[in-house]
Amino acid sequence: MTFKILSIDGGGIRGVYPAHILKCFEEKLGINLLESFDMIAGTSTGSIIAAGIACDIRASEMVSMYREHGADIFNKRKSKIPFKKESVATKLMLESVYDSASLSAVLKSVFQEIKLGDITKPLILPATDIGNGGVHVFKSAYDTNFLRDKLVKIRDAVQASCSAPTFFDPHKVDEYLLSDGGLWANNPALAAVIDAQKRLGIPYDDIQVVSIGTGHSIVAYGLM
């Protein structure tokens, strides 16, 4: 029996692209994404979409969220450190570029108080444990041997996965200080496949993955 995994990469505001692709799946194929996949994984901006699908939020609503609140999420904070040449390094170390409170507000409006323990679909949201120098993978409580995250609010897990260093502040969840899952799994497909095999006992040959990226930024280089 085929085990279908949906994996969504990180990529900041470019998350609108996989959200739009999934919107086309819904409209052109007439499918419900939550019912069409057996496991969902997302990193960074992909975690917003993955968690949304796991909560049975339509992709069209996720597209609207990016368009309406993208500017709020990527809202540059006003620096409290006076700008001087010698303070540039200090600013980079002590202040994130964007206001994490704005991201928190948007995620709260989307996910409210839903907890990972409320989700029945296998959900994988990678983050990075910068306090202990390791990986941290949030999971819904689909495995009775893995109940660590059942009381964690989805918005907290998503914010941790989204908190790219220098762009957003690290996010604390319980005793863990967490940052962007893209530091080690910007494409979470492999993490999902491994979990399906080890946790659920799915044979490798039975696994099919739909992995959606966020494209690439075009950067122009020139002489200084």
Residues of each region from the PLM?
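Hydrophobic, mid-to-C-terminal alpha-helical segments
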Residues: 175, 193-223
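Patatin-like phospholipase
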Residues: 2-7, 12-107, 142, 147, ...
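A short acidic (Asp/Glu
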Residues: 52-53, 188, 219-223
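Extended hydrophobic secondary-structure segments that form protein cores and membrane-embedded regions
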Residues: 5-8, 38-44, 123-128, 207-219
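Short aromatic-enriched loop/helix-cap "lid" or pocket-rim segments at secondary-structure transitions
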Residues: 77-79, 221-224
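Surface cap/lid and interfacial helix-loop subdomains adjacent to catalytic sites
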Residues: 91, 96-122, 186, 208, ...
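Active-site gating loop/helix substructures
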Residues: 13, 93, 117-198
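Surface-exposed acidic, glycine-flexible loop patches that form ligand/cofactor-binding
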Residues: 29-34, 108-123, 198-203
